[in-house]
Amino acid sequence: MKKITVIDSHTGGEPTRLVIDGFPDLGRGSMAERLQILEREHDQWRRACVLEPRGSDVLVGALLCQPQAGDACAGVIFFNNSGYLGMCGHGTIGLVRSLYHLGRIDQGVHRIETPVGTVEATLHEDLSVSVRNVPAYRYRTQVMLQLPGHGKVHGDIAWGGNWFFLISDHGQRIALDNVEALTHYTRDVRQALEAAGITGAEGGVIDHIELFADDPQADSRNFVLCPGKAYDRSPCGTGTSAKLACLAADGKLAPGQAWRQASVIGSQFSAHYEKVGEQLIPILRGSAHISAEATLLLDDSDPFVWGIGS
């Protein structure tokens, strides 16, 4: 019987499962190198952790790793039901809150190594978390897609830790009771991008689709389709970072100016950015809540020990 020890949390409604023990040893390389080892040699552990029957399509996993640098409090590898994520904003907030719950960190600034770089996270007195993300930028603007049944659609391609296609003029109603239609629409967008060979820089796969609309309680409301066909319940940290990059490129948001991003379920992140040389550094703030302490049991006699669909 194999065992995986986890802490579950949610950030603005979006769950994170932090793996604190039980995965195979991945060595002492960088987080990017360890991700490659996990994906190439031990991917069944990801599947066991986040696929049904122990997980679900919406669940994001976060493997807690020993960092390389002495000034970092943790390393982390993010994954979901379809594969791996370079960075995850809501997951980083959940990670920090979980480490505090475990008594491993206190309030203050903490450095966290990810596969796409080191981020800084601040645990505040009210236990909200600010994340100083990796640099974000807009790669292309007003990219035209021919979408079957919807005609021409224009969007921006931006990096916020993952690749996003961001659409403001889409004609969709962003509301929780319209999630099924929004999911179909954004899947069509992703398929159209793939069919047209449209990518991020250096062929990066655009696996997140983000729609925006007005919101009476925030600067914007979004709907984000994540890899694996699930939608983000939170406002999406890397997606908000990509949005900041687009707003800055259009001259619509100044450094330090606050932006409040709402999700399709109404949860919110506050955000702003700083310029460091030519780089745009997003800073996001949100809250996570602990929902479970658990031990996942992997019984070799279980036909779905490594997940349904594995």
From Swiss-Prot:
Its EC number is 5.1.1.8. Gene3D superfamilies: Diaminopimelate Epimerase, Chain A, domain 1. Coiled coil: none annotated. It is an enzyme of class 5 (isomerase). InterPro entries: Pro_racemase_fam (IPR008794). PANTHER family: TRANS-3-HYDROXY-L-PROLINE DEHYDRATASE (PTHR33442:SF1). Belongs to the proline racemase family. Catalyzes the epimerization of trans-4-hydroxy-L-proline (t4LHyp) to cis-4-hydroxy-D-proline (c4DHyp). Is likely involved in a degradation pathway that converts t4LHyp to alpha-ketoglutarate. Displays no proline racemase activity. This is 4-hydroxyproline 2-epimerase. It comes from Pseudomonas fluorescens (strain ATCC BAA-477 / NRRL B-23932 / Pf-5).
